[in-house]
Amino acid sequence: LQASADKNGPETAARDYALQDDSKLTLPTPQAAIYQAAPNPDMNLYWGELHLHTSESFDATLFGNSIGIEDAYRFAKGEPLSSAGGEVMQLSRPLDFVAITDHAEGFGTRTHCGDPNLSLGERAACWLANEPNPMIFKILTKGVRGTATPGDLSKPAGVYQRTTRQSPKPGSFPTCKFGDGALERCLKNAINDWARYIHLADKYYEPGVLTTLIGYEYSPGMPEQGKHHRNVIFRTNSVPERALSSLDVPNAIELWKGLEATCGKDCDFLTMPHNPNKAWGLTYSRFTWDGQQYGEDDWRLRQRREPLTEIFQIKGAQ
């Protein structure tokens, strides 16, 4: 039977393929899947970035980032952008929202560096601040981080030793040390820099296309490259005149109190800590990094102002 079937069965030769007319086949008409969810704006999914640095942040400069604030906004809207190395980058889809959160500690510290009348010391300080180099990194880790205290391994995890530490001062940055009135110049420029961030966020805000949130990073230093940083995000463009940094307030409790005191009408904000994996147990400790202990009012203040924690960024999962 098998031999008979092989002998008398149909054959399909390669030459017959060209004779086939697929247009004669009956194919179903593709139908787009239609799903209409019930209106619920609180459950819509949006994609964005709440931790973004530009060339205005010194650590970004160290990594060779030469992209400015306006370029960052255009990139968030989906425009292509060329990196310092010539690579063309573009998002697969534009973002729905973005907050540029450059380090507030750097506001005003490099604004004057384009002045041709700077002294030799001022020019040297500006070179250190603008050119990625190991020397300035060492200066910052020693000077701007304040006075360190030795760790106490006998203490339970998450409980920092209550030893007084000296918080760094506004004049710690090299560019704010040299020249007559250098510190006052940096403080004035810091206010002007912050005003520029507010202006550009408003400029690139496009309802229904891109929501630009005004923000910055609060970045106190810790020993051994520890991180205890927070991004400060404002709800509207009604924001304080100054961006409070770790040069103004020494810890998170004082940050929240300071922001509440300087926020005017229609001003609202939240903070988000990041890198809790490098905070040496302090992110959820009952002590601040400089030894201040949380009271009941402090916990309620944190509950009101810090409902979120960042869990992923360019450094990886935390």
State where each predicted segment sits:
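Extended, charged catalytic domains and RNA/DNA-binding interfaces, predominantly
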Residues: 4-318
